[in-house]
Amino acid sequence: MQRLPRQIGMKNALGMMLTGRHVSAEEGMKLGFVNEVVEPDNLIEAAKNWAKQIEQCSPMSIRATKQVAYENFNEPDLEKSMKAKYSAVGELFGSEDFIEGPVAFAEKRLPNWKGK
């Protein structure tokens, strides 16, 4: 109940919460709390595609992204959140992965993430 209004707006959230109305996957996608709609037979393949896309990123970058996103979810002050220090971001900046990304890009090859 606390997060839904932030994701889809107070009007839509209250409409759903006060009436108990269920929404279809398509409506959930239009409202912005569903990422993708697939046929049931394609569900596993779609989930694997999402996992494959995430897997291609640096593990340290994923960790830092999640930390910043979760820690700032309820922070209304953008300037404050931009100035905050995040341990995972600091670790990323000093890592081999931080160097590997631009090098791989410059060499036109896929990066070899080490997670360190």
Task: Describe the predicted segments one by one.
Residues A25, V34-K83, N112-K116:
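C-terminal long alpha-helix characteristic of the crotonase
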Residues L31-G32, K108:
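Structural motif
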Residues M1-M17, K30-L31, A46, W50:
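CoA-thioester-processing core
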Residues M16-M17, V68, N72, S87-F93:
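Helix-loop "lid/cap" segments that line or gate small-molecule binding pockets
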Residues M1, M10-A13, A51, S61-K66, ...:
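A general structural signal for well-ordered alpha-helical segments in protein cores
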Residues G20-E27:
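Acidic, divalent-metal-coordinating active-site segment for phosphoryl/phosphodiester hydrolysis
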